[in-house]
Swiss-Prot record:
It comes from the Bacteria. It comes from Mycoplasma pneumoniae (strain ATCC 29342 / M129 / Subtype 1) (Mycoplasmoides pneumoniae). ATP binds at residues 22-29. This is Uncharacterized protein MG268 homolog. Pfam families: dNK. CDD domains: dNK. Keywords: ATP-binding, Nucleotide-binding. GO terms for molecular function: ATP binding; deoxynucleoside kinase activity. GO terms for cellular component: cytoplasm. Coiled coil: none annotated. PANTHER family: DEOXYADENOSINE KINASE, DEOXYNUCLEOSIDE KINASE.
Amino acid sequence: MKTPLKPKFQPAKIANAVVVGGMIAFGKTTIAESLAKHLKGSKVIYELEEQDQLADLLLAKMYERNDELLYAPLFQLYFTLNRFNKYRKECNNKTPTIFDRSIFEDWLFAKQNIHRPSIFTYYNHLWNGIVKELIFKHGIPALYVILEGDWELFEQRLFQRNRKVEIDNFAKNKDYFKNLYKIYGEFIKNVCYDFGISHCIVNANQSVESITKQVLEVLKSKNLDWEII
């Protein structure tokens, strides 16, 4: 039986948070930082932190694909647990928090990277337990911003940002990137529908200013107790 791409829980509360999600290199961090400038008192929680040497090591080992049966599961478990810890601590601050990607997207990365069924079964069980706590105790985000674009935009942005680990290992990971790209947008939309998460879909091939303006208009329409500046 194939593992379904759709989680099956329903939300219990809304967190004081926004998530910016989407395919690798579509500009999530840039958009998150731009939104933070317009939401008074808000902060950005980054997916990757400069001082996190373990995350850098695991990411590099995964992309190198020399021992992916070991490093891919370690990478996915580390990111999932680390992201959940950040979310539960920061998702209900007095002022909005903007998250660079979410734990929902971690499942998709894990599905593409963990190749041993027994290990993925363990990961899936762990992930489901974490997500139950997230949605019932801490809450789903008030808005999920989904950045979409074409394959050409992905390649352009990936090489433009020039992260050594991605460029050096692009050939090894091209099929992985293509498979991820094909299902990414629909997966996030399905997650939002299944979890009852309010979301907006934005074309990533626009200026930062244009995307920011569109998202702020959506936030204004939701009548949240957030000060937009």
